[in-house]
């Protein structure tokens, strides 16, 4: 990873999408496109974000399966935020499997949580509970653990009806 990509990724992680865009706005390589897509999503331009993430995923080579999978997860998150529940769940499952296979536990867990949230939105409580049961929240950072507990609470609330 070159220094501009690293700096842009750190800016995004620190909540500075404009700083990230400053570093990669004119670049067309797949890592830059992916970071631009994430930055645009953080800024609320979801259509452009999806397009950039798709271009990035197509641009990553066969040896960059993890990068492609991360793009799929990011695109799935955008679809969920947009309430586009018709996005391909199989693509998210495949991305999650790839991430798990390559040891990216954090992004694999995030993909699992996205699947759970989608299943909750479409009313498939049993499936959501099954997926959630397979996710271990302990090694996750606090924000991801909180998302896990919110999903558990969401299932419990729907079961009360």
Task: Walk through the language-model features, giving the residues of each.
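Residue register of alpha-helical TPR repeats
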Residues: 2, 31, 38, 68-70, ...
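Alpha-helical segment of the N-proximal tetratricopeptide repeat
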Residues: 2-23
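Residue-level signature for tetratricopeptide repeat
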Residues: 10, 39, 78, 118, ...
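Structural motif corresponding to the intra-repeat A-B loop/turn of tetratricopeptide repeats
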Residues: 14, 43, 82, 102, ...
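TPR-repeat structural position
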Residues: 17-18, 46, 85, 105, ...
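Amphipathic alpha-helical segments of tetratricopeptide repeats
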Residues: 21, 28, 54-60, 93-103, ...
